[in-house]
């Protein structure tokens, strides 16, 4: 019997996150900007998320487009973000980008760092 391996789902980039990024890009006045999401060592749990604007798409970047907004993720970060959802929340706790990551085995209290 042949078993079909289930492929990890790609990264989900919510409509609200794309809308907020589009608003920020418009505020910057540079339509060439793209949102780069990355994982780096640090934080109280070992890894932390980072967000920055970038005009350059690197050779090893995975790119996604949502509602005209381009998201960039480098190959090292991608392995930690497969299956994650990048969202933007504006509620009683404040306005912030949030990453729901199924690969994170533990997270810190603030949610900005994790262990994979």
Curated annotation (Swiss-Prot):
Keywords: Iron, Iron-sulfur, Metal-binding. Its cofactor is iron-sulfur cluster. Gene3D superfamilies: HesB-like domain (2.60.300.12). PROSITE patterns: HESB (PS01152). GO terms for molecular function: 2 iron, 2 sulfur cluster binding; 4 iron, 4 sulfur cluster binding; iron ion binding. Binds 1 iron-sulfur cluster per subunit. Homodimer. Required for insertion of 4Fe-4S clusters. This is Putative iron-sulfur cluster insertion protein ErpA. SUPFAM superfamilies: HesB-like domain. Belongs to the HesB/IscA family. It comes from Herminiimonas arsenicoxydans. Pfam families: Fe-S_biosyn (PF01521). One of its GO terms (biological process) is iron-sulfur cluster assembly. It comes from the Bacteria. Iron-sulfur cluster binds at residues 44, 108, 110.
